[in-house]
């Protein structure tokens, strides 16, 4: 009778803590015992090599490529002209490779892509982020609105030229069918090729999934941040893409109009919430790792994020259970010695310290509650709980001398800190582990890997 009661109590605790929702296992982190990673994906090589300005990325727990380059062993991003023969129209109106996917050879594209991957990522054991940045068109016909409507018009004309005998209604239906078929083949086969060639990488498309919650400019105080239901439904229809991805790369870029506002948090939160939803539906064995793209400065400016907006971006991403965040930047960051010094000052100030705060807090929570076999995620995704070091218990200290700079975190969790974490966070176990605290090793789950 006693054992039955214990089992009942354990089940009740499980349901209460997890709100009755099954939490999928997560893929183990890219680096052991690093539940939340911060990447640097900005072309700042010139700061180090030309201007002799070290941005101190490593000091502040940031993963970067050699010489802080845009692409390398940690993260490689493929723009339209870097991978295969991607059909599109650029921002200047120049046409490339047949413009629409059904007007270009997929075989030619894949052959060129193979050569490009070997050239750009020569290391076959590549274990970093492989990000394909194709934003000119979307694979779903109904999502090619605004400036992207040109791809629908071109597809209709393409179908009309091939089948002049058909009615306009049939031509439009055929154009949609042929476009979506070709777009799917281009995106899916490119992804599968990359994964076959560099199987240890984390592959996916930048800005997928999207949420289309950009109406903060018009809604003002009425803005909710929620993804429109039609867009969530359209994301569901991209299951073929999620199943073939090994990582998701949504973005949480903040425009300056959102600076230190409630709308900023709403915007970021719901984009991440949608990404985490997609991550959990993509596979049956584990949730895909989510790496959110962010900017350390407000979009289209060189103004650094406020402390509040660092919490909104970095803090929210970690608390929601993402595997990491990727800081993207432009050539402006390294355009002059003054630009480099500005980035360095921000890195040595609020940005670097907050990154250390969150990455350390995530690591401590994983160690204390999940036995290093899982990461801490919010029990209630809409809560305002964050993975922060408790200021009354921890101190972040930066030491520097003529040869090196290092960050040391001193302190320990107090009882009230443990209570806060237990009340607000739960464990998402890595593959092969289960239990409330990821304390049970499961050979069955390992065999699924």
From Swiss-Prot:
The keyword ATP-binding does not apply. Its main location: secreted. One of its GO terms (molecular function) is hyalurononglucosaminidase activity. Disulfide bonds join 47-340, 211-227, 365-376, 370-427, 429-438. The active site is at 135 (proton donor). Residues 1-23 form the signal peptide. GO terms for biological process: carbohydrate metabolic process; hyaluronan catabolic process. It is an enzyme of class 3 (hydrolase). Expressed by the venom gland. It is found in: Secreted. It holds the Pfam family Glyco_hydro_56. Residues 427-438 form the EGF-like domain. It catalyses: Random hydrolysis of (1->4)-linkages between N-acetyl-beta-D-glucosamine and D-glucuronate residues in hyaluronate. InterPro entries: Aldolase_TIM, Glycoside_hydrolase_SF, Hyaluronidase. Its EC number is 3.2.1.35. Glycans are attached at residues 67, 103, 111, 153, 357, 401. Keywords: Disulfide bond, EGF-like domain, Glycoprotein, Glycosidase, Hydrolase, Secreted, Signal. Snake venom endo-hyaluronidase that degrades hyaluronan to smaller oligosaccharide fragments. In venom, it is not toxic by itself, but increases the diffusion of other venom proteins by degrading the extracellular matrix. In addition, it displays antiedematogenic activity. PANTHER family: HYALURONIDASE. Monomer. This is Hyaluronidase. It comes from Echis pyramidum leakeyi.
